[in-house]
Amino acid sequence: MTEHNVRNFNINFGPQHPAAHGVLRLVLELDGEIVERVDPHIGLLHRGTEKLIETKTYLQAVPYFDRLDYVAPMNQEHAYAMAVEKLLGIEIPIRGQLIRVLYSEIGRILSHLLNVTTQAMDVGALTPPLWGFEEREKLMVFYERASGSRMHAAYFRPGGVHQDLPEQLVQDIGAWCDPFLKALDDIDNLLTGNRIFKQRNVDIGVVSLDECWAWGFSGVMVRGSGAAWDLRRAQPYECYSDLEFDIPIGKNGDNYDRYLIRMIEMRESVRIMKQCVNRLLSDAKTGPFSSIDGKVVPPKRGEMKRSMEALIHHFKLYTEGYHVPAGEVYAAVEAPKGEFGVYLVSDGTNKPYRCKIRAPGYAHLQAMDFMCRGHQLADVAAVLGSLDIVFGEVDR
């Protein structure tokens, strides 16, 4: 019998690959078409965000968070704003909390819509992205009407939100909800029962619950494996404890379960949005939307025209910024991709001493190796789509 010299084949997947979602470079070791090893090379989008934040005042650091997970920008600002508020010990008025929750859920829908539809595109379905982007476009307009920008909003500031929502905008968001559920049903009917979509996702990228905890997973990745762990329920922040919503969990921990969870979560987000809209139009219709002590949030323009103190105050807040008491704090929100945390160290000056950003996608990407082992080459793209990776937050 002749001896065969077996040599595994190494290929590069990315960084300019259409399924690589940005600037991912994977070095794959293949035995025929079976994946033996996956080696993610990251850092191609590294911008030194954490170091840059140390040279900026607390207010100037806000826009950096928009540019991390840039498909759902306001959710990142939320974690940072909460960290600064914890250090300052300030409370947000209820109207400000409702506006924050409303826009956090809009961000969740933005992210899940993009993920579910591009995952469908990765496995060959071309219609869902067109429908998904149609709905995302409407949500981007809501972002723009609240903050003036479609993506990089810088709308959640420490102390509340930057400006109030007009009543008409709140009504328009309420009117968007039901037609969206119908559009979601269309995408659902197209994908959920689709034979090819199921063949490409069922039993691919299976993760057990123990492996989830060992690899530091969070968000949809743990819920897909059967843990009902959601920071909005486990460690409620803002006014989530007063809102009604369910947490979907999967039982197989595969790509398909994670897809189903994202679909259900979009429906739950709409449910939360409806509750926020109702309250913003009834009991929280008027009242302050940001902290009123005047130490953190700059005074209103009208006040500055009348009062010299307000003008001085405004000037101080935008040049020097406010001083945050020394200490360290960790604040986390349930971002669309998982637990997005900000560990903030203050030395009592007007600039953060250290700001560590805990991006959920970073922990998920490192598990590519053990999730893809033994699968076909084509399944690498499916697993990658299911992880929901955005490089802004992975490379920071």
Swiss-Prot record:
It is a peripheral membrane protein. Its EC number is 7.1.1.-. Keywords: Cell inner membrane, Cell membrane, Membrane, NAD, Quinone, Translocase, Transport, Ubiquinone. Gene3D superfamilies: Cytochrome-c3 Hydrogenase, chain B (1.10.645.10). It comes from the Bacteria. Disulfide bonds: none annotated. It is found in: Cell inner membrane. It catalyses: a quinone + NADH + 5 H(+)(in) = a quinol + NAD(+) + 4 H(+)(out). It holds the Pfam family Complex1_49kDa. InterPro entries: NADH_Q_OxRdtase_suD (IPR001135), NADH_UbQ_OxRdtase_49kDa_CS (IPR014029), NDH1_su_D/H (IPR022885), NiFe-Hase_large (IPR029014). Belongs to the complex I 49 kDa subunit family. PANTHER family: NADH DEHYDROGENASE [UBIQUINONE] IRON-SULFUR PROTEIN 2, MITOCHONDRIAL, NADH-UBIQUINONE OXIDOREDUCTASE 49 KDA SUBUNIT. NCBIfam families: NuoD, PRK06075.1. NDH-1 is composed of 14 different subunits. Subunits NuoB, C, D, E, F, and G constitute the peripheral sector of the complex. This is NADH-quinone oxidoreductase subunit D. The gene is nuoD.
